[in-house]
């Protein structure tokens, strides 16, 4: 298991594992020690340096992205060929970084379009080489957990809530959730999560239970009608928590989730901004309707696919018994 985001600390019950995004470093993120030593010997990086993408000149960022990708491929190739494994799960995360800082260059024929395309040619070549080196009885799957689109505006939703009278603070020096006032009626967390400041649930709750439905409906309507400076609706849709969340911890689910239209990146933060709509260093953002999936199996049916379908598909391909009722998804094979 190599470089899966948010998997630190590495599990000790798998053959090899290096955790990915949000890990403190290879020294602590890799198990066993032999894996750590090998990764360090090839200058393996857990992630490209996104701060380099903030510069107007993207040359250093692009060079760092290639170095990260090259070492990732070398490590994948090494262990795919060396080890006897049942499941090899690896993540090329550098595509996400490149998309965040170069995607608009690609879509709108800007300065770094050629560098963007050349990076993806290399990704494609590496995937092809991995596929060619796999034994005949191994099925290769390539999946992304989201798509990408050009970014036009960052939307600072807590500033919008403050401007519209939903959110207020104890004083002018505010920077986190603890600083909201007892009069606040709603607040937002990334990405696009909205919470009614409900009495009995929130530490400084102000909205009585009897007013919850009406307040939520009012906020939902306001979000659905919100337009950006370009006249386009910010939200593709706004989903109530009963529709989106189920399980043992649904009590902590947001009351509303805003799904953005392409071009709007939904932000939160409690420090305040001069304007609701702004621009940051990124020009590409996640999208939710154009993720990709490739299954190298003639029996695979890829229609109406959900991210949840990947786990039962892998179990089927590995001929593992499982209770289909325990999974939200369904096997594609």
Report each predicted region and the residues it spans.
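Structural motif
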Residues: 87-91, 141, 294
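Short secondary-structure boundary/capping segments
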Residues: 104-108, 154-163, 254, 272-275
């Amino acid at each position: 298991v190599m470089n899966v985001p948010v998997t630190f600390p590495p599990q000790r019950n798998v053959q090899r594992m290096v955790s990915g995004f949000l890990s403190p470093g290879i020294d602590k993120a890799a198990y066993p020690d032999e894996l750590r030593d090998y990764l360090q010997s090839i200058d393996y990086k857990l992630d490209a340096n996104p701060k380099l993408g903030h510069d107007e000149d993207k040359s250093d960022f692009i060079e760092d992205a290639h170095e990260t990708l090259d070492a990732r491929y070398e490590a994948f190739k090494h262990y795919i060929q060396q080890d006897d494994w049942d499941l090899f799960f690896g993540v090329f995360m550098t595509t996400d970084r490149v998309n965040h800082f170069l995607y608009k260059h690609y879509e709108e024929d800007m300065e770094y379009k050629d560098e963007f395309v050349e990076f993806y040619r290399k990704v494609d070549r590496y995937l092809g080489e991995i596929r060619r080196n796999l034994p005949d009885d191994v099925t290769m799957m390539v999946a992304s957990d989201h798509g990408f689109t050009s970014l036009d505006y960052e939307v600072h939703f807590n500033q919008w809530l403050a401007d519209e009278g939903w959110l207020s603070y104890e004083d002018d020096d505010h920077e986190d959730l603890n600083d909201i006032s007892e009069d606040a009626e709603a607040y937002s967390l990334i990405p696009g999560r909205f919470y009614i400041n409900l009495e009995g649930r929130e530490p400084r709750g102000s909205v009585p239970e009897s007013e919850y439905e009406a307040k939520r409906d009012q906020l939902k309507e306001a979000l659905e009608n919100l337009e950006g400076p370009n006249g386009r609706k910010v939200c593709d849709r706004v989903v109530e928590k009963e529709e989106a969340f189920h399980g043992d911890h649904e009590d902590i689910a947001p009351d509303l989730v805003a799904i953005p239209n392409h071009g709007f990146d939904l932000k939160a933060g409690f420090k305040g901004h001069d304007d609701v709509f702004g621009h940051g260093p990124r020009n590409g953002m996640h999208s939710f309707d154009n993720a990709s999936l490739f299954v190298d199996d003639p029996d695979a049916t890829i229609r109406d696919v959900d991210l949840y379908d990947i786990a039962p598909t892998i179990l089927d391909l590995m001929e593992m018994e499982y209770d289909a009722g325990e999974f939200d998804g369904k096997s594609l094979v």
